[in-house]
Amino acid sequence: MVERLTGRERQQALQSIAGWREVEGRDAIARSFVFTDFNEAFGFMTRVALVAEKADHHPEWRNVYKTVEVVLTTHDAGGVTRRDIDLAAAMNAIAGQFGVA
C-alpha cells in the first residue's frame, strides 16, 4: 500500500505542480483546467483517462463545457500520496499540450 504524504511532504510536492491546491476539509488536492472549448476539454480527459487507467489510479472529476475540475486522493491510503502528485504532474503535462499552463 502507498503511504500518505505528511503535511510537509504535501506542501513540498505542491510547489512542483503548478495550479494545484489542497482541498479544504479533506486530504485531497484539486485543480481546474480551462480549455478553448468542449472538444479540447474532452480530449484532455480522454488522454488523462489512458494514463490513469495504466497507473490504476483514477481522478474524481467533472466537465462543464470547456472546464475540467479535478480532485485527487488515494482512497486506499486515506489521503494524498505520491500517486496523486504523479498523476497531477501528468495532467499538467497533458494540459500543456493544449496550451493550458
UniProtKB/Swiss-Prot annotation:
InterPro entries: PCD_sf, Pterin_deHydtase. The lineage of its organism: Bacteria, Pseudomonadati, Pseudomonadota, Alphaproteobacteria, Hyphomicrobiales. GO terms for molecular function: 4-alpha-hydroxytetrahydrobiopterin dehydratase activity. It comes from the Bacteria. Keywords: Lyase. Pfam families: Pterin_4a. This is Putative pterin-4-alpha-carbinolamine dehydratase. Its EC number is 4.2.1.96. The keyword Protein biosynthesis does not apply. Belongs to the pterin-4-alpha-carbinolamine dehydratase family. It comes from Rhodopseudomonas palustris (strain HaA2). GO terms for biological process: tetrahydrobiopterin biosynthetic process. It catalyses: (4aS,6R)-4a-hydroxy-L-erythro-5,6,7,8-tetrahydrobiopterin = (6R)-L-erythro-6,7-dihydrobiopterin + H2O. PANTHER family: PTERIN-4-ALPHA-CARBINOLAMINE DEHYDRATASE (PTHR12599:SF0).
